[in-house]
Regions:
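Helix-to-loop junction immediately C-terminal to a conserved catalytic motif
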Residues: 52
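Conserved ABC ATPase "signature" region
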Residues: 108-133
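Hydrophobic anchor residue at the start of the ABC signature
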Residues: 151
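Conserved ABC transporter NBD signature motif
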Residues: 60-74
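A short, flexible loop at the N-terminus of ABC-type nucleotide-binding domains that lies
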Residues: 1-7, 11-24
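Conserved ABC ATPase signature
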Residues: 137-141, 145
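Catalytic Walker B motif of ABC-type/P-loop ATPase nucleotide-binding domains
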Residues: 162-165
């Protein structure tokens, strides 16, 4: 397997004066499913944003698909806590937005393959069990349904790496089971790497490997280490 995320002596935060966490050595391979746990405010979201290059690392090495710049963004799908959906638009329109934000898909549209994009959008909506809501404005959906729209929008981008921040929150146990099953089928069949932030330990156990961010007694910031849960 090839390395997707490679971090060495990495410090994360929003400025050198407010370092939140340190990652001494981390390797995540293609196709792995990994969870990150830790107390609220410990730096889990900041770590995901650093991987996605939405936040620049303070220091150290962070390579995603063997690059340290923003060029990997096109193959990274990010599901944030705040979903950022267009509430007055339909489910279809929101998922379509995810599909066409990928530059390679835009090129395929100009090459008269628009029907492939439409098929991809509909398949992704079906994967998240939203076909009966396809023409509904997002604002009319429940919180759990809106979260499934956000997941579908990310999948429609065709990413090789998915970063999911509490992506199972606001879902009841049965829906969690169904959404996780659909996500697992998708990432395993497409050899996609999935990194999830979770506060729920039972849900974190669904991953193959788990890492914990926790305060280091010798410093003011947290340290990432692999744990068994």
């Amino acid at each position: 397997m090839s390395s997707v995320i490679h971090a060495v002596n990495l410090k994360i935060g929003y400025s050198p004066d407010s370092i939140l966490g340190e990652i001494d050595n981390l390797e995540i391979e293609q196709g792995e499913i990994v969870s990150i746990v830790g107390e609220s405010g410990i730096g889990k979201t900041t770590f995901l944003k650093s991987i996605a290059r939405l936040v620049n690392p303070i220091s150290g090495t962070l390579k995603v698909f063997d690059t340290e710049g923003v060029s990997a963004r096109g193959v990274i799908g990010y599901i944030p806590q705040k979903l950022g959906l267009i509430k007055h638009e339909t489910v279809y329109s929101n998922v379509l937005e995810g599909a066409i934000c990928n530059e390679s898909i835009l090129r395929s549209i100009s090459g008269f393959h628009e029907e492939k994009v439409i098929d991809k959008v509909k398949e992704t909506i079906e994967l998240m069990n939203l076909s009966d809501k396809i023409d509904e404005p997002v604002k009319r959906l429940s919180g759990g349904q809106q979260r499934r729209v956000a997941i579908a929008r990310t999948i429609a981008q065709g990413p090789k790496l998915i970063l999911a921040d509490e992506f199972l929150s606001e879902l009841d146990d049965k829906t969690v089971e169904n959404v996780w099953k659909s996500m697992l089928e998708y990432v395993t069949s497409n050899n996609i790497t999935l990194v999830i932030v979770e506060h729920n330990i039972e849900r974190a156990r669904l991953a193959e490997r788990c890492f914990k961010l926790e305060k280091n007694e010798e410093s003011d910031y947290s340290i990432l280490s692999e744990v068994k849960i």
